[in-house]
Regions:
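Class I SAM-dependent methyltransferase Rossmann-like catalytic core
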Residues: 1-35
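A short glycine-rich, Lys/Arg-flanked "PGG" loop and its adjoining helix->strand segment in the class I
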Residues: 113-128
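Conserved catalytic loop of SAM-dependent methyltransferase domains
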Residues: 171-196, 204-206
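C-terminal lobe and adjacent flexible extensions of AdoMet/dcAdoMet transferase-like proteins
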Residues: 195-262
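Short, glycine-/aromatic-enriched active-site segment of Class I SAM-dependent methyltransferases
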Residues: 134-150
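Hydrophobic beta-strand segment of the Class I
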Residues: 100-101
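Short alpha-helix
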Residues: 149-173, 177
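Class I SAM-dependent methyltransferase SAM/SAH-binding core
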Residues: 27, 32-90
Length: 262
């Protein structure tokens, strides 16, 4: 089952629980990748809540959203850098991404092998990828009130296995969302305490697995997908050559009333 992009948007930006979840994940992300100065940063799935912090300092930031989910113009009011794509064929040149965030993607993938093959293809030498999936042992994967309760959850071992099969080397594990996935205000007031204690108490299980991985060179050499020479769509050519394109010019502050404030 694929969630609609507006449903996920509303969760993260228009609900108290979603805003708390966004803050928890971003806090972890800031400690994992505190600086992306001069780097090409790519997000796939619904990654825009976690990309904004990188807009000002990164060389380029692009958000890819799968066709099954839909797409939103983002960021508002700046020039759009989000693109609707086929999850099996990304319009990005091979090896030109330095940091990759996969969020709300693997658990909804129609072909996880093809998706991870594309992730491997676009990641450059020395690049890092962060895979975020619902924890099958956590409470969040069992709640229908959040996007984390949709799709297929993973255990850490299952995620590691998939990544190794597709040329990634799992390196660091992180967890987030120790708070209860409840919309009740009397329970939400305990969220900051639970998030703080969750990092210290091993018996508490986070609702989100965050796994940082690097790329093992040439592990899938000979793959027809990896070996194919594609040209990215015109809106993304600047990602490969560092030349700004009007659609993805993050320095363009021109406002548009049609864009959603996210």
């Amino acid at each position: 089952m694929h969630l609609d992009v507006k449903e996920i948007r509303d969760f993260y930006y228009r609900s108290t629980l979603g805003r708390a979840a966004r803050a928890s994940i971003n806090k972890n992300l800031s400690s994992i990748w505190p600086d992306t100065n001069g780097l090409n940063v790519l997000g796939f799935g619904f990654s825009i809540p976690f990309l904004r912090k990188y807009l000002d300092t990164s060389r380029r930031v692009v958000a890819l959203m799968p066709a099954q989910m839909g797409v939103l113009a983002w960021p508002s009011p700046e020039a759009n850098v989000s693109v609707l794509v086929d999850e099996k064929r990304w319009p990005i040149d091979t090896g030109h991404v330095d940091r990759l965030i996969m969020s709300h993607s693997l658990e909804h993938a129609s072909d996880i092998s093809a998706l991870l093959t594309e992730a491997y293809r676009v990641l450059g030498p020395g690049g890092r990828a962060l895979f975020m999936v619902p924890n099958r042992a956590g409470l969040w994967s069992r709640s229908d009130d959040t996007p984390f309760g949709q799709g297929k959850p993973f255990s850490s071992g299952q995620l590691e296995t998939q990544l190794r099969l597709h040329g990634f080397l799992p390196e660091k594990h992180f967890s987030a969302l120790y708070m209860l996935p409840s919309k009740k205000r009397n329970l939400q007031r305990f969220s900051p305490f639970l998030e703080k204690m969750g990092q210290k108490l091993p018996f508490l299980v986070g609702g989100l697995i965050m796994l940082e991985a690097s790329k093992i060179p040439d592990v899938t050499k000979g793959s027809p997908i990896l070996d194919s020479k594609r040209s990215p769509s015109s809106v993304l050519k600047g990602l490969a050559k560092g030349k700004p394109q009007p659609v993805l010019n993050i320095n363009n502050k021109k406002r548009s009333s049609k864009r959603i404030e996210i």
